Curated annotation (Swiss-Prot):
Cofactor binding note from Swiss-Prot or TrEMBL: Magnesium is required for nucleotidyltransferase activity. Nickel for phosphatase activity.
UniProt cross-references to HAMAP family, sorted A to Z: CCA_bact_type1, CCA_bact_type2
UniProt keyword annotation of Nucleotide-binding present: yes
UniProt EC number: 2.7.7.72, 3.1.3.-, 3.1.4.-
Biological processes annotated in GO: RNA repair; tRNA 3'-terminal CCA addition
Function statement: Catalyzes the addition and repair of the essential 3'-terminal CCA sequence in tRNAs without using a nucleic acid template. Adds these three nucleotides in the order of C, C, and A to the tRNA nucleotide-73, using CTP and ATP as substrates and producing inorganic pyrophosphate. tRNA 3'-terminal CCA addition is required both for tRNA processing and repair. Also involved in tRNA surveillance by mediating tandem CCA addition to generate a CCACCA at the 3' terminus of unstable tRNAs. While stable tRNAs receive only 3'-terminal CCA, unstable tRNAs are marked with CCACCA and rapidly degraded.
InterPro entries tied to this protein: CCA_bact, HD/PDEase_dom, HD_domain, NT_sf, PolA_pol_head_dom, PolyA_RNA-bd, tRNA_CCA-adding_enzyme
Note: A single active site specifically recognizes both ATP and CTP and is responsible for their addition.
Protein name, entry field: Multifunctional CCA protein
GO molecular-function terms, A-Z: ATP binding; CCA tRNA nucleotidyltransferase activity; cyclic-nucleotide phosphodiesterase activity; magnesium ion binding; phosphatase activity; tRNA binding
Quaternary structure, from the entry: Monomer. Can also form homodimers and oligomers.
Length: 412
């Protein structure tokens, strides 16, 4: 029996990145030997065991053979005669097909070290094309390591295109697509994930609402980048700088979906694109089974981001109604989330990357003023039932009006 550290732990250690999870491969052993040594079996489809002390995963070396469609259509073979090289060959990328023995020596049968040095994401073997999930995984790795200068090898991107055009991605379940997307949204450069999907044709298959934005023009006065798809990726990049939250980043990604519905004869203007985009947000989220909290914020951002841009022109009643509409009294974090997504929208434009966004500050200030109006005072004044809410709203509007008169600049 020989045990090797494999995959991401080896890769990230070589890149000087923190190692979170450690996975191990066991060569020359059987399930019974692992059980006799005190390991606990957890794998249903192939032999994976938990170490009795560390609870890290130890998998018997195995090979995989395509036996059906999609990313689940594989038959696994695990036996003492499966070599380490056999096991590493089934992995997706050469940088993930590295192993380390107990002496610290790196085993690299597929030039993963060279690709690490050259910052290349390259597939290990043609078997890559048998698993459609790998298209998403490579896009996610490209986003995760973009800040280190990694790029996808030409032949790997070509294979990803072939897989997409062959209809392989249609076998992916919504849950797996969302899981990879959610993980990509946590990276430093989530926009790279969607750019890679577009480069290989997968964006049109998995995210047609986003793909439809490319080639749709916006007024050059407001959008020097002109193309709405490019603007969308720029805003996502900016959102990633402003917030680590997946819901903020996803909402930013979806903020302009309605522009994809504008008839070409009306281009480059997109009146009413916010409310129009709400239906597309719902459609996308229902298809991918996006969690409701993330979906709800995306709907609100699509509907209200343009309103926040015009904040100085809003009357106090409209401002308080906005807080009602986003359910800020019960979910106050939405005010900050809406401020951040709107700021990302403004700064996600060519030449505006460092622009100030005072509307975000005014939105936050108005919220502090509105929520500082005490409910207790209304009740103590003798208001009852629905009258409490009406009086509370009246006082909030009055407080915001007073603040706006003093602190918010008059519209030109």
């Amino acid at each position: 029996m020989k045990i090797y550290l494999v995959g991401g732990a080896v890769r990230d250690a070589l890149l000087g990145l923190p190692v979170k999870d450690r996975d191990w491969v066991v060569v020359g052993s059987t399930p019974q030997e692992m059980l006799d040594a005190g390991y606990q079996q957890v794998g249903r489809d192939f032999p994976v065991f938990l170490h009795p002390q560390t609870h890290e995963e130890y998998a018997l070396a195995r090979t995989e053979r395509k036996s059906g469609s999609g990313y689940t259509g594989f038959t696994c073979y695990a036996a003492p005669d499966v070599t380490l090289e056999d096991d590493l060959k089934r992995r997706d990328l050469t940088i993930n097909a590295l192993a380390q023995d107990d002496n610290g020596e790196i085993i690299d049968p597929y030039n993963g070290l060279g690709d690490l040095q050259n910052r290349l994401l390259r597939h290990v073997s043609p078997a890559f094309g048998e698993d459609p999930l790998r298209v998403l995984r490579v896009a996610r790795f490209a986003a995760r390591y973009a800040h280190l200068g990694f790029r996808i090898a030409d032949e790997t991107l070509a294979l990803m295109r072939e897989m997409t055009h062959a209809g392989e991605l249609e076998h992916l379940t919504p849950e797996r697509v969302w899981k990879e997307t959610e993980s990509a949204l946590t990276t430093r450069n989530p926009q790279v994930f969607f750019q890679v999907l577009r480069d290989c044709g997968a964006l049109r298959v998995l995210f047609p609402e986003i793909d439809a934005l490319f080639g749709v023009p916006a007024p050059a006065r407001w959008h020097p980048e002109i193309d709405t798809g490019i603007h969308t990726l720029m805003t996502l990049s900016m959102a990633a700088m402003l917030s680590p939250q997946v819901d903020v980043r996803f909402a930013t990604l979806c903020h302009d979906l309605g522009k994809g519905l504008t008839p070409p004869e009306l281009w480059p203007r997109h009146h009413g694109h916010g409310p129009a985009g709400v239906k597309l947000v719902e459609q996308l989220c229902q298809r991918l089974r996006v969690p409701s909290e993330i979906r709800d914020l995306a709907r609100l951002v699509a509907e209200f981001h343009d309103l926040i841009h015009t904040f100085p022109m809003l009357n106090p009643k409209t401002i308080v109604k906005l807080f009602d509409s986003i359910d800020a009294w019960r979910k106050p974090q939405r005010v900050e989330q809406l401020a951040l997504t709107s700021e990302a929208d403004v700064r996600g434009r060519t030449g505006f990357e460092s622009a100030d966004y005072p509307q975000g500050r005014w939105l936050r200030e108005a919220w502090e003023v509105a929520q500082s109006v005490p409910t207790k005072a209304v009740v103590e004044a003798g208001f009852k039932g629905v009258g409490i809410r009406e009086e509370l709203t009246r006082r909030r509007i009055a407080a915001v009006a007073s603040w706006k008169e003093q602190r918010c600049p008059k519209p030109d």
